[in-house]
Amino acid sequence: MTQRKDAPLVALIAGEASGDILGAGLMQALENRYPGARFIGVGGEEMAQAGLTSLFPMEKLSVMGITEVLSHLPELLRLRKSLVRFLLEQRPDVVVGIDSPDFTLPIARRLHDRGLKTVHYVSPSVWAWRQGRIKGIKKSIDLMLTLLPFEARFYEEHDVPVAFVGHPLADRIPLETDVAGARKALALDRDARILAVLPGSRGGEVGQLMPAFLDAMVALNHQDPTLQYVIPAANAARREQIQTLLNTQPNLPVSLIDGQSRTVMAAADVVLMASGTATLEGLLLNKPMVVGYRVGAVTYAIVSRLIKSEFFSLPNLLCRQEMVPELLQSQLTTEAIVAAVRRWFDQPEQAQALKIQFQSVHQQLRGGASEKAAAAVARLLEA
């Protein structure tokens, strides 16, 4: 299907909520450049509102961990096959896979082999583990768009076309956090000491982390009954899952809130959270945090042998040093969580030093990420 240069057909594939946000920003920036552009592929509500015609619901791609992926593998393979067939029929001017690399990069390889221009937006953690993937990536895409500067350096070293675009969240989130405004918006006590607890957005993630987080909350409550807890539930299913666990501790002073995770973090003094994109939001909000990561035993046995990076949380990777405690797998004990959380509450001077470092990183990541990504895609379209 041949398109006019000023009205390209752009395919985008997102598999998670964070990718949906990035995709919507890219679509809006591309539409500013090409008012007649059309968008097809797979996305969520944000991308739909930006004008995407989605082949199937993005939620079908949201699975976690190796064993979890295996249980969904037949359906994922079927979806991938139908998506490849659809895109080969449509022949878009460019195909942009957004994150979810185990799903999107094999699609890019097939489409690239058939002459379509392909872009991957959000680098997989190839610099941290399974570095051999770089060879396959190089054969699958015309361009990598990275959110973080150290990722771009890695691709340059391996002769993969790359553009560092920064992170859209760094543009959206102010350098100074309005704690009082966030607390007012959530009807929280202005003077309370608040711990935000973010156990993740996926069922498997919450199932792995929330019991450990809850045990720590109970222990903290015994030590300091004045401490308050706020948990944002990513969706109705996560709310029900979390509420079931909270029902076992009816006397805990906890507020369970629908969504608004960024506002919840902004309102908090300290954040206890799952590893992932939300840790970057925590950094941009200047929040002291404790980061937990736990997956199934089989997944961890495989992953632990392949990890090359010293850190797994984005704040530590971006700062190139251990700024926040990371509790991995068996390290995620009640005692360790309590000690790490208490350290932030008891040592405000360390929290202030953290804020200075985080604001420096925030500045590096600012500067119109969606527009930079659109400019890089436009250069490829017009090449």
UniProtKB/Swiss-Prot annotation:
PANTHER family per record: LIPID-A-DISACCHARIDE SYNTHASE (PTHR30372), LIPID-A-DISACCHARIDE SYNTHASE, MITOCHONDRIAL-RELATED (PTHR30372:SF4)
One GO MF term: phospholipid binding
UniProt-listed CDD domains: Glycosyltransferase_GTB-type
Listed name of the protein: Lipid-A-disaccharide synthase
Associated pathway: Bacterial outer membrane biogenesis; LPS lipid A biosynthesis
One Gene Ontology biological process: lipid A biosynthetic process
Signal sequence annotation: none
Entries under Gene3D superfamilies matching the protein: Glycogen Phosphorylase B
Catalytic activity, EC: 2.4.1.182
Catalyzed reaction equations: a lipid X + a UDP-2-N,3-O-bis[(3R)-3-hydroxyacyl]-alpha-D-glucosamine = a lipid A disaccharide + UDP + H(+)
Family: Belongs to the LpxB family.
InterPro entries assigned to the protein according to its UniProt record, in alphabetical order: Glyco_trans_19
Function summary: Condensation of UDP-2,3-diacylglucosamine and 2,3-diacylglucosamine-1-phosphate to form lipid A disaccharide, a precursor of lipid A, a phosphorylated glycolipid that anchors the lipopolysaccharide to the outer membrane of the cell.
A GO cellular component annotation in the UniProt record: membrane
Keywords, sorted A to Z: Glycosyltransferase, Lipid A biosynthesis, Lipid biosynthesis, Lipid metabolism, Transferase
